[in-house]
């Protein structure tokens, strides 16, 4: 039986210690809050692994309108333009917030901010820290601030398992570790639980990030949005490790080119070439690999000996697998990297469930549309983490705890990853998605270790099955063209289960 911990009653609970969670906790201060993280504070978060940086218009030839135009173009017709504009207009504020918390962005030899260029950006607007150590440096600085703030209680080593509801509103959170189970009563929960890359064999995310926040919110009845859109980073370091190391877009921004095993630059004739939107580059690389070829990122001519200075982290990662990027091309492949979909929220971070806010990759704001523009994710995390935190401070209506369920088992993705990797990858087809839906449904309804990962995977599969076009990061070989008009899709888990059962029944009829 879970122990009810009353000493933190009705404090806001923040789940996750990536950029969005850390910023939210610091923004709420001095109001007392509880920050829950399944590992050490700031560890095992995608934020800490970010190499590129944050996008903000700072150069004389740039402005928010150009940034918005690039974002909408990358989003391939599916961005919420109002949400995107409002977030981008706060980019400068987000930049100053990070500076306020002690983050010192890189400067050039003249003492000016060093602005990087990444794929699908029309201007240099990526601020970074320590070359390619942006995420690590930012998370370390914010973690120090959180640990030094007496208003923030940090609970490490606890995994959120279930959102407690009473009369359709949030009333608490059920957490567990290998030795104990506890309940934190609260009418205010902010999920900043990250993405879903851990559902894939090839991922650049922490492998434990399978979408736990999405699964919990879905079981509680929250509306989900755009779940089909999974961004595959085109250039993960191709090796046998899991997760795969990221070879940042910034390397291509500095002039590195993609070649196949014959030394051919296969992106040269594609608009934007190596700096085309991520979905285009990932699909081109996948096509080369599917035909049995190999793909390499060649920085020898563009950077040469400067590579190790500009990209020290990537250099070290390459050296670990026997690659010297100064003298050798880097073997690369696409890997699940970022989820544009998630829990649907409004402009203040509120979900469809009273008392539940969401920020960061777990949320779907509409900023990214069908395909995220590089380095917009850190921007979104800061802006939406700040907004949600401010909104939460205006809401505090305690609700008594309802029935406390049996604690769900610790999630395990082992049985789900092969299904997702084979059927919901860069290139998709209805036959594969049918197989995925049929395979996932028993896990969803089984209440076992695979249940929560299967819920998230099934959401992706059904959303993808219903989108009968290729748009942004969602590419279907059976529907290679885009519809003339399109719209975002919003559904609950109940909606998805109804469609899934119908799909399985139809498949059985065809087989019989």
Curated annotation (Swiss-Prot):
Keyword vocabulary terms for this entry: Cytoplasm, FAD, Flavoprotein, Nucleotide-binding, Oxidoreductase, Pyridine nucleotide biosynthesis
Residues carrying the site annotation Important in orienting the L-aspartate substrate: 118
Free-text remark on how the cofactor is bound: Binds 1 FAD per subunit.
Top enzyme class: oxidoreductase
Active site: 278
Gene3D superfamilies: FAD/NAD(P)-binding domain (3.50.50.60), Fumarate reductase/succinate dehydrogenase flavoprotein-like, C-terminal domain (1.20.58.100), Succinate dehydrogenase/fumarate reductase flavoprotein, catalytic domain (3.90.700.10)
GO cellular component: cytoplasm
Pathway where it operates: Cofactor biosynthesis; NAD(+) biosynthesis; iminoaspartate from L-aspartate (oxidase route): step 1/1
InterPro entries per record: FAD-dep_OxRdtase_2_FAD-bd (IPR003953), FAD/NAD-bd_sf (IPR036188), Fum_R/Succ_DH_flav-like_C_sf (IPR037099), Fum_Rdtase/Succ_DH_flav-like_C (IPR015939), NadB (IPR005288), Succ_DH/fumarate_Rdtase_cat_sf (IPR027477)
Domain of life of the organism encoding this protein: Bacteria
Binding-site residues for FAD, renumbered to this chain: 17-20, 46-53, 361, 377-378
PANTHER family: L-ASPARTATE OXIDASE (PTHR42716), L-ASPARTATE OXIDASE, CHLOROPLASTIC (PTHR42716:SF2)
Protein name: L-aspartate oxidase
């Amino acid at each position: 039986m879970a122990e009810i911990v009353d000493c933190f009653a009705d404090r806001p609970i923040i789940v996750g210690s990536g950029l969005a969670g850390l910023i939210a906790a610091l923004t709420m201060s001095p109001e007392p809050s509880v920050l829950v993280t399944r590992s050490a504070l700031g560890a095992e978060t995608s934020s800490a692994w970010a190499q590129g940086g944050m996008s903000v218009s700072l150069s004389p030839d740039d402005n928010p309108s150009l940034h918005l135009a690039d974002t909408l173009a990358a989003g391939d017709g599916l961005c919420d333009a109002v949400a995107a504009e409002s977030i981008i207009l706060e980019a400068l504020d987000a930049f100053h917030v990070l500076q306020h918390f002690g983050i010192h962005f890189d400067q050039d030899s003249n003492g000016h901010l060093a602005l990087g260029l990444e794929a699908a950006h029309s201007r240099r607007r990526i601020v970074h820290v320590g070359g390619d150590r942006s995420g690590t440096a930012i998370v370390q600085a914010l973690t120090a601030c959180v640990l030094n703030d007496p208003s923030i209680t940090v609970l490490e080593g606890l995994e959120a398992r279930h959102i407690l509801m009473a009369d359709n509103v949030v009333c608490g959170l059920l957490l567990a570790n290998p030795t104990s189970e506890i309940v934190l009563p609260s009418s205010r929960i902010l999920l900043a639980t990250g993405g879903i890359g851990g559902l894939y064999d090839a991922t650049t995310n922490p492998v434990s990030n399978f979408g736990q926040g999405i699964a919990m919110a879905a079981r509680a009845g929250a509306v989900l949005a755009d779940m089909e859109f999974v961004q595959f980073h085109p250039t993960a370091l191709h090796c046998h490790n899991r997760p795969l190391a990221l070879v940042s877009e910034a390397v291509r921004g500095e002039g590195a080119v993609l070649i196949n095993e014959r030394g051919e630059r296969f992106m040269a004739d594609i608009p934007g070439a190596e700096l085309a939107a991520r979905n285009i580059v990932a699909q081109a690389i996948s096509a080369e690999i599917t035909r049995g070829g190999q793909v390499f990122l060649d920085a020898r001519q563009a950077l040469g000996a400067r590579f190790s200075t500009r990209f020290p982290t990537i250099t070290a990662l390459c050296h670990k697998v026997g690659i010297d990027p100064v003298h050798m091309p880097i073997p690369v492949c696409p890997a699940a990297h970022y989820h544009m979909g998630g829990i649907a929220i409004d402009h203040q971070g509120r979900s469809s469930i009273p008392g539940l806010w969401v920020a960061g990759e777990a949320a779907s704001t509409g900023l990214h549309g069908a395909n995220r523009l590089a380095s917009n994710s850190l921007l979104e995390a800061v802006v939406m983490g700040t907004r949600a935190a401010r909104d939460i401070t205006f809401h505090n209506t305690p609700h008594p705890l309802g029935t406390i369920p049996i604690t769900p088992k610790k999630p395990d993705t082992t049985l789900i990853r092969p299904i997702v990797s084979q059927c919901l990858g860069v290139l998709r087809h209805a036959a594969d998605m049918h197989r995925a839906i049929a395979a996932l449904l028993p896990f969803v309804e089984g209440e076992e270790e695979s249940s929560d990962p299967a819920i998230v995977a099934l959401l992706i599969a059904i959303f993808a099955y219903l989108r009968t076009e290729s748009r942004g990061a969602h590419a279907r070989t059976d529907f290679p063209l885009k519809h003339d008009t399109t719209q975002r899709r919003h559904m609950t888990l109940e909606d998805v289960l109804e469609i899934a059962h119908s799909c399985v029944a139809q498949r059985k009829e065809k087989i019989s």
